[in-house]
């Protein structure tokens, strides 16, 4: 949450968003819902201190998902993306040996998203783009977004996908189910559309990193395959099996269970898994390496891939 964007929003209430202070603590207010703005989201020194505590050498910095701002009018969305991207670039410039930047894009206007992506790659050297699992309910596999995905592919960037809302509303009331169930569900819906739509066949070099261990994707891939074999409707746009397409995705290691992470590694290979933290939020890891060490039968090669190798490859630093 770059300070420049925070200053721009402070006290404003246009489009239902602004930043406010309560007892000296800054909050982001989005149409009446308050979210604390942790110091690590905007203060480089605090970010580095947290990384040191977690034994993280290099971190890719991305915006907090509630601030994708896909619901804003196109011009306002572009302005918000520019503020975020330039703010992240300034953070990275403070400590370029330890921080990398991820772009955020105004996906409500695909043409503007392409222009902004080309700008941040040229001006800031970003190698990654953070996107929501959907854009106000429209899937990333929708044809209207294909040119954005193609530009990401052509520029050699990868996509980091993180939900910002739960598109499936029924049964999600209470117990924070919109997060615990809804976020992984949104991830599997997003991945399924990319697979079955033929988008991944068309975009052969597109790399997509999914948060939270891929949601339910790696654990239900057999069901995807079964449908593709036995139901013609699943083969309308692609003849490529979902299991083959699974290897086109990358995943963070944030599964909250060592046996789940072991299964993920066995399904896709350690070279497609990278450390994830969800920092500084309460659903993340405070000791990601310690969590990794709990994985049964983890080999030194697998550990090296997950700790370093996969991230280096995605960022073009291998």
Segment roles from a protein language model:
Residues 5-39, 166-185, 224-246:
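Active-site gating loops and adjacent loop-to-helix segments of metal-dependent hydrolytic enzymes
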Residues 7, 162, 212:
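Histidine-centered divalent metal-coordination motifs
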Residues 5-58, 86-94, 115-119, 206, ...:
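Mid-to-C-terminal alpha-helical segments outside catalytic/metal-binding sites
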Residues 134, 164-165, 195, 214, ...:
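Catalytic metal-binding/acid-base residues of hydrolase active sites
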Residues 57-191:
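Active-site gating/metal-coordination segments in enzymes
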